[in-house]
């Protein structure tokens, strides 16, 4: 027993040094994933402890949305939800593992999916930016309405009271200092038929909503995180309407607070827009997905940016977030089954974190 204790003590400086090297190379090593279903919470907790923590994950963007038993607005709960007890299990394992939780609710855009509204517009249809656009029985893209996802109207006088109560409750139960508001792929904004938004500048509308959320969080010393696509000019860059904006919201980049954390996602190519955000004064993480060759190039890029930029710029390139767009359960399944390397999103995750770990050896 004494020998084991001595070995553990002697190993501590080595482990601490390895951690310092890892943090220096890649301060944020994140995973963005949907929150698990309540019945699978214990399995997800074990996954964090046995798979994520040993690989060096230190940031977990948890897409909760309406998968929580909100007390402030129980009418907005999904049919089955995580309870406070479930959440505290996730909080406990993340604290133990040194993992920062950033809970997420999709705000402004992504208020519907395919044929159904999400809970906010289903319960409060008056918040809909485009009430004349009806949800289809069968969803196809493209379509005559340009419907990808619905948005709430950012100028509706009653929407923010509800949204802010959800934010407060979720950040408190997760004991979180940061909150992710989504804010990606907002196509419906400033519509001509909207009695409040018609004729308004879309960049100003978008910036106004972003700053409003940011300012609310700042009252309790919390920080806003968001996806960066609406802040990129899709026409000038050739990046198009998904990974960038084609409806003029890109000008909002000069209208929003600089302490907002940008999650800069690109999945088809290793586009270098992290440099753009850093030059504008934002802290930024590059977000990758399922093309593991692209993911590796993006990981190498962010390391290179940190090495080769000015001291001021170096500190703005914060790291990598791997995004997983299936259910939490499907990612856990990938680790439980053989031939995990053939599952592309998980392969990208493993490659990125194994690469950073190899570089971190002192």
List where the protein language model places each region.
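N-terminal hydrophobic targeting/anchoring segments and the immediately downstream early-domain regions
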Residues: 19-50, 54-55, 59, 126, ...
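Aromatic-lined carbohydrate-binding surfaces of glycoside hydrolases
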Residues: 32-245, 252-254
């Amino acid at each position: 027993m004494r020998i084991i204790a001595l070995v553990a003590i002697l190993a501590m400086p080595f482990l601490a040094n390895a951690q310092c090297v890892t943090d220096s190379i890649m301060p944020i090593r994140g995973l963005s994933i949907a929150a698990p279903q309540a019945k699978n919470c214990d399995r997800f907790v074990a996954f964090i402890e046995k798979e994520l923590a040993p690989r060096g994950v230190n940031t977990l963007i948890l897409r909760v949305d309406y998968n929580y038993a909100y007390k402030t607005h129980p009418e907005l709960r999904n049919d089955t939800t995580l309870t406070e007890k479930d959440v505290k299990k996730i909080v406990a394992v993340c604290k133990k593992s040194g993992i920062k939780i950033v809970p997420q609710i999709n705000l402004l855009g992504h208020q519907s999916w395919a044929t159904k509204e999400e809970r906010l517009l289903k319960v409060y249809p008056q918040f809909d930016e485009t009430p004349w656009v009806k949800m289809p029985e069968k969803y196809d893209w493209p379509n005559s309405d340009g419907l990808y996802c619905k948005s709430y109207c950012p100028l509706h006088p009653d929407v923010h009271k509800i949204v802010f109560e959800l934010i407060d409750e979720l950040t408190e139960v997760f004991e979180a200092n940061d909150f992710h508001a989504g804010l990606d792929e907002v196509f419906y904004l400033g519509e001509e038929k909207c009695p409040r938004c018609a004729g308004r500048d879309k960049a100003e509308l978008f910036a106004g909503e972003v700053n409003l959320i940011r300012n609310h969080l700042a009252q309790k010393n919390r920080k806003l995180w968001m996806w960066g696509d609406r802040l990129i000019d899709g026409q000038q860059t050739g990046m198009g309407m998904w990974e960038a904006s084609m409806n003029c919201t890109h000008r909002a980049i000069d209208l929003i607070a600089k302490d907002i954390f940008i999650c800069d996602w690109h999945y088809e190519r290793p586009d270098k827009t992290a440099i753009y955000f850093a030059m504008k004064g934002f802290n930024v993480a590059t977000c990758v997905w399922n093309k593991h060759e692209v993911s590796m190039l993006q990981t190498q890029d962010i390391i290179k940016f940190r090495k080769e930029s000015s001291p001021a710029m170096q500190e703005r390139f914060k790291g990598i977030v791997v995004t997983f767009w299936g259910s939490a359960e499907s990612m856990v399944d990938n680790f439980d089954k053989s031939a995990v390397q053939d599952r592309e999103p998980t392969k990208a995750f493993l490659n990125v974190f194994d690469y950073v770990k190899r570089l971190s050896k002192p």
